[in-house]
Amino acid sequence: MINESVSKREGFHESISRETSASNALGLYNKFNDERNPRYRTMIAELHEFFHLTLAETITETDVKELECNKEKAAKFRKLMPKMLNNCRELTQRKSYIPYNSEFNGNDEKQKKFQLLHQHQIVLSFQEFCDELAKLIIDAHVLSFLTRCDYSYEIIPKNWTSFYKLFQYVMGAVGPIISYVPVNYPMIRKELGFETLTIFQYYDSKLFECMKSHFGREFSTLVSATIHHYIHMFPITNTMLEKEVPMLRIMSNCNFSIEGLSPKDFYMKTLRQYYCEESNLRPRLETFKNFKVLLTRNALLASLFSPEWVSDANDLFISHLLLNKKSISEYIEIGKDTYDEEKERYFKTETHFSLLMFRNAFEAKNMLSKFKEFCDDAVSEKLKAAYGSNHDTERLFDEVVQLANVDHLKIYSDSIEYHLCNLLGSTSKAIEQYVKYFESHLFIIVRKIKTTKKDLPRDMKIKYLNENLPILRLKFVNLPTFPNFFERSIFRKTILQSDQNSSFIKDILPVYKDSLMELFKQRIITNVSQEDEMRYRDQYQPYLSQFFQPVEVMADLRIKYASFLSFYENIEAAVKFGKTYNENNSKSFFPLIFDRERIPKVFQQSNEVKKNFVLPQEMDDTWNQFLRNYHEQNKVEDSDASKKELYPMWNLHHCEVESPYIIQDGTNLIFELTLFQTCVLTLFNESDHLTLQVISEQTKLAYKDLALVLKSFCNYKILTRDIDNTYSINESFKPDMKKVKNGKLRVVLPRTASLQSSNTGGERTSSAHHEGSNSQWTQELLKACITRSVKSERNGLDYDHLFETVKQQIKGFSVGEFKDALAKLLRDKFITRDESTATYKY
């Protein structure tokens, strides 16, 4: 018998002893009629006392190392263990009887009958007895641990590992006893609950059942707290992996469920909630830059609980940060915000993170189509938001340029171009709006250089200009006709703003060429250095080809850009001539003489236009004086110009007329008019009221031209008209100051009509050009429609279906024009023809 005085905290364990007595009654000797066998009763009591001793010697300990170093206690347990194992053997191998029937003898007394109990039942009952004693030890240790930690979700995780190691020591002390039956009677392991668990895993589950009974519904909160304890622990090291024994790892080993979930599923659920709530794991610049570090840490954290969870945990992390449209959209926004600071092109900003990593993540999950869809949706949403209900093209192109700058590898550039053209109606309209946007920014940058950076050296000014130009990197910049849009704009501005004081002539025109070449060279010369190409070849190989154009396209582009330079030189020469004449001869006249071949076709006239209308006397004298001076000068000098004839382009003549209206700065408002408008308006210097017939007789203008001019003045309320077709100066005229720029108001001819004259001397073309009727313009529209139609069909279109699709979009073209446009697109490799299916594809 073990001396009961061994316990130093007898008072603490009295309740345990009293509870155990009931267990004894259920255990072996009252149940199996062992009252008459004191030997078995003694063995049962000795086992009970051994468990009692184990509890007494360990309940006050908090550091298992002290127990392991206490040789006296270890010797005590070792000394008693052989006897305890012998008791186990005796109690499981004994014979026991139970009454099964009673009979009356002749004296009316009951006679008991007994039946030998099967050993299987004896063994099971002994294991129940051991489980009951083990449960009492577990309950006592759990209660002591939770009491010390004050049931705190913060303190328990910090002390869990030390408690569990103490628990392992205690269960190891009684291990030979509680494992006696499973080890020696393997045939009944299944009935005991040890089919899939080891004996210690079984008692680990009993440990968690006990803790669950203390926390009830809040048990899952405790488990979450232990997970978050490790999540917020920095850094996670291999040493930690060796020393820590997380609660969830033990639960996983013993298949203990939480809220009906397996430990792994519960961990993934907790991790998912953490990702959503943790601000440091939202799409941010630092998060993307440290992506690999965070992913490695995520893997180490999962391996702390189970190495088998690493793959799923990393998939969850990647899914949260990469595999969704929101993250792609946020990454693009981050790129827009940081591009101005980094000022790097293509690969330079890809060292930390890039959209390619998103793409690779989607591709690894066989979700590449989803990636393209998400990119397309993100681009579409951003462009629509920028364009808005008020159709703000300035904001739209701000967004387009920023999106293109982020997309260094041109992963979603096709989406940008598609949605841009879709919002603006067509490719040609998108290019037209971009030209306006480019020129607007060029004006702003030049003005800023003049005001805030005027002291910089010239090369620094040029560098600043080039760095801040809104360069657009989309495929339509490759169109051979792309420079033509700029040519038309430059030509038009040169005509409208040709005077000595014009900011366009003084400041913009001198830098326009270099600025455009900075834009154009993006299509001719790649910014990828050989060093970068070699460095990133493996990772970026699929995209390198996007930076280079086919040889045929390159040759065509160079020809077009050479043609642009020639056009630009002609503009410069014309402006130089006009400046010289303006300074030396007439301050009010600025002549521009162009080579006919260099004038954009939409502005050209087929034949010479004779002056079959009447100019105001002063203007007529100035014009005739110019002709005399020009011919006389060229005749004397025997220049090349003497061999050429002058063809006046009356429809393009531009006049500035000073009005009597005073604006806010105290100066007279200046009207910007066409020559024909000027001829009409100057008549009102002599009379305030003129009839249509009188105006027609004095100007000799054709009725269509005259009607359009008068309508333009009425639209701006400069003139009024009565029921007798009499036109008068509007005495109460007030200009719309929103339309006044630099003290000038341009009176625009109505767009709804065409200025044409059928005078006998020739044909005159209006300055309100309807470019869609021009053959060259029709070609561009056809090419844009063909490209868009083919692009929208994944499987391509055959010739007939393609023709019908384009025919639904634009009208008024011939089959020959359609075939020419199709042939040019095939030549320039904007589309291809699949010979096997006879279809055209993008």
UniProtKB/Swiss-Prot annotation:
Stated consequence of mutating residue 791 to A/R: Prevents RUB1/NEDD8 modification
Region: Disordered, residue numbers: 755-775
Main location, first listed in the record: cytoplasm
PTM comment, free text: Neddylated. HRT1-binding is necessary for RUB1/NEDD8 modification of RTT101. The modification enhances ubiquitin-ligase activity.
Matching SUPFAM superfamilies: Cullin homology domain (SSF75632)
Pathway: Protein modification; protein ubiquitination
The family this protein is said to belong to: Belongs to the cullin family.
Spans annotated as Required for interaction with MMS1: 1-50
Origin species: Saccharomyces cerevisiae (strain ATCC 204508 / S288c) (Baker's yeast)
Assembly mode: Component of multiple cullin-RING ligases (CRLs) composed of 4 subunits: the RING protein HRT1, the cullin RTT101, a linker protein MMS1, and one of many alternative substrate receptors belonging to a protein family described as DCAF (DDB1- and CUL4-associated factor). Component of a RTT101(MMS1-MMS22) complex with the substrate receptor MMS22. This complex further interacts with RTT107 and CTF4 to form RTT101-MMS1-MMS22-RTT107 and RTT101-MMS1-MMS22-CTF4 complexes respectively. Component of a RTT101(MSS1-CRT10) complex with the substrate receptor CRT10.
GO biological process terms held by the UniProt record: cell division; DNA repair; heterochromatin formation; nonfunctional rRNA decay; nucleosome assembly; protein ubiquitination; regulation of DNA replication; regulation of mitotic nuclear division
Cross-link Glycyl lysine isopeptide (Lys-Gly) (interchain with G-Cter in NEDD8) placement: 791
Gene Ontology CC: Cul3-RING ubiquitin ligase complex; Cul8-RING ubiquitin ligase complex; cytoplasm; nucleus
Keywords, comma-separated and alphabetical: Cell cycle, Cell division, Cytoplasm, DNA damage, DNA repair, Isopeptide bond, Nucleus, Ubl conjugation, Ubl conjugation pathway
Biased composition (Polar residues): 755-765
Effect of deleting the gene: Delays anaphase progression.
Entry protein name: Cullin-8
Function: Core component of multiple cullin-RING-based E3 ubiquitin-protein ligase complexes (CRLs), which mediate the ubiquitination of target proteins. As a scaffold protein may contribute to catalysis through positioning of the substrate and the ubiquitin-conjugating enzyme. The CRL associates with CDC34 as the E2 ubiquitin-conjugating enzyme. The functional specificity of the CRL depends on the type of the associated substrate receptor protein.
Single GO term (MF): ubiquitin-protein transferase activity
Subcellular location: Cytoplasm; Nucleus
Cited Gene3D superfamilies: Cullin, Chain C, Domain 2
